[in-house]
């Protein structure tokens, strides 16, 4: 089989915004099922992580211009064929990029859905699998859907080709190349949380879905392809014009990270309704794209220090939302899962969001879960977690979700 190692030509960045993407190559027909930005228009960037072995495919997604990367990883099998971890939207462009790999390395043999709760991962799998009719789909156990729990076949998964990942990773046909371990399911009453981490032994690469991220100081390449969200959030007031500068892109990205990680950090205030409306009236851009001039954000002067405390130079991090709302419901199970992974041999992590490649050791991976055991200098500031703590209390005090257990674990350690 001929191997062409040439890079796929990438698209040049558009001026500002996805509204200018008219090509059918980027069209995602099922966008209304999960109507989040960029809706029906999704670019894909393919990057070769390890020559002839590992590739990432980045798209973007978000709400109210709080946009982050979402990532699929493809690994070449030692024999012939490809394994796909966490598919993204199978646009014409995306599938063309995948088929270039198929021509060189063989067909897509396995498609992995590593989560049960992430709609942004789940709803791509069925349409993606239909593009590769010989692939077997493996899903994390205990799949569910909301508001009605439907069979996977009703959600577009190919019934005859979809299997559940067994607890024992030796029972799958790719066990000679991969290990995996399953976290969960963590009962949240409203649903469950589960994640399957994969280890590609030959390349010493760990694949995770949502559990670990690394926050970069500059916007990832796929985010730079659509600059308007960056520039929208870079402003300090609705009265400011939207200006495309490198400084503004970085500024907007850092604020987007604070939004996506904390919802509302301690350095963000909400102006009065009167001020919001007055500023909107005086905004130089009252278009629908700019939300008619509405900009309900008032960043404090020290906002950038909050980003630095969050990023900590790109160290592996468990997202604050998982820390405050999910993993603290099952601290012992989470730590056992993290301990299992820390016993594996790897030197890099590919997550489904934010930084595409994290150079990290098993010890550094395990340290990211220290928040479940004790407070330390690595912990995130409590003042920035306050909004998430308040949401948590609103949910568990009436019994909507189970109460957190991590605090009890810390007290027991003392």
Which sequence ranges carry the predicted segments?
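Beta-sheet entry/capping signal
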Residues: 82-83, 110, 136, 204-205, ...
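Short, catalytically relevant binding-site loops at active-site mouths
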Residues: 144-146, 213-215, 356
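Catalytic core of the metallo-beta-lactamase
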Residues: 2-96, 150-238, 263-268, 272-273, ...
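Cap/insert and terminal regions of metallo-dependent hydrolase folds
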Residues: 88, 100-110, 116-118, 123-131, ...
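A structural signal for short, well-ordered beta-strand segments and their strand-loop junctions
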Residues: 137-140, 197, 206-211, 348-352
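Active-site HxH/HxHxD metal-binding segment of metal-dependent hydrolases
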Residues: 101-174
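Short active-site-adjacent helix-start/loop capping segments
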Residues: 65-66, 92-95, 119-122, 146-148, ...
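Short glycine-rich, polar/acidic loop-and-turn segments at beta strand-coil junctions
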Residues: 60-61, 77-79, 86-90, 112, ...
